[in-house]
Amino acid sequence: LYDLGYREFMLADDIFTSDQKWATEVCDAIYKSKTKMIWTCTNGIRVESADDNLFKSLRRAGCYRVSFGFESGNDKVLKAFGKGGRATVEQARKAVKLARNAGIDANGYFMVGLSADTKDTMQDTIDFARTIPVDMIKCSISIAFPGTVMFDNYVKKGLIRSFDWDEYMIYTAKDLF
């Protein structure tokens, strides 16, 4: 790719680091290829399994930025959301610190309006987003898509306003529930 004029690539794999041994082997292969390309890992870094060795491997392989799906700044919401049943706000803070210590920039993704969210827990998320030392944040409003546990729960509670699937777009100005 470098010979074709490319200087950077983005790795977008939701489960890239779920098997850290494999992720480290991929990083080692990139490093051994002596590519001059830099890259980012736009998703796939789980805060509950992040460790120093992983970030050092990523950095050595040319990765300069990772993104974390923090989702919420409230542990109860994280547990209800099902972030592996293990992710916590403290682990998120630790993961960002480890990335930074390895010389890697960090982005954070947040969601509000999760099924367990309240006004107070959404404020926790806002407060967390303001204090976590990341370079960029993205905040999304959660949408209960058909086929998800959230959607099924909302149907049971009578909260779904439309069953017209064409209205289920990621970005919409209409109230869906």
Task: List each language-model region with its residue ranges.
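An active-site-proximal structural segment forming one wall of the substrate-binding cleft
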Residues: 1
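Active-site groove signature of glycoside hydrolases
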Residues: 4-12
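A structural motif corresponding to the C-terminal lobe/cap of the Radical SAM core domain
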Residues: 15-21, 25-177
